[in-house]
Amino acid sequence: CDFRPAFGEIFSDYLVGYDYWGHCDVDLIWGDIRKFVTDDVLTKYKRIFSRGHCSIYENSSEVNAFYRTLPACGCQDWKNVFQSEKSCCFDEWAGHCGGGMSQIMKLNGIEIYDEVCSADINVNHGKFQINRMPKYKNLYFEYKEGKLALKANDTSREVLCAHFQKREISVNKNINYEKYFFIAPNYVTSEKRMIRTHFKEEKLFEIKRLMKRVQSKVR
């Protein structure tokens, strides 16, 4: 991911004739992209979204060279990043690594379109908890004919995509992916009733896990 900001130059031959280019992770399920990435957004911003799992750049010689031409302003220098054997998360904010391209662009006064459109799922929880969004109870996703929605007890919110990083998920084999399906924290199915069953099993699992923790402390 550290080389992603340089893709505009690295793959310039492939980008001839295109107005924009981008990068994303492979553990995503996409919804209706153009509902969120409108013509107005594309023409107003040189970069759309600031996270590594989903970013779009204007395809111009100026923007494609940002990674090496913008002053680092105390953040990570691209030459050091490209020579490092460690992951520097250079394609995003990377505050824990010293600052990446998103931070560098901000410090240079380049505005990034960064509305919360995607469901970036927190890796530290078994249940779905979305970074930069409120906590929802019994959260799952519904995909239907090209649209992806976040669903909870009294909530329905369409999202650009959902990011299922570092998560093992069982998939029902009899799913019509072009029509509709549902995604629970560890299960994908075309039957909505199975989602309710999953939440009951999940609550039981959480109770058992809590009891084990209590027992280990008592001992």
Question: Predicted regions: what is each one?
Answer:
Residues W30-S61:
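Conserved donor-nucleotide/metal-binding helix-loop-beta segment in metal-dependent transferases, i.e.
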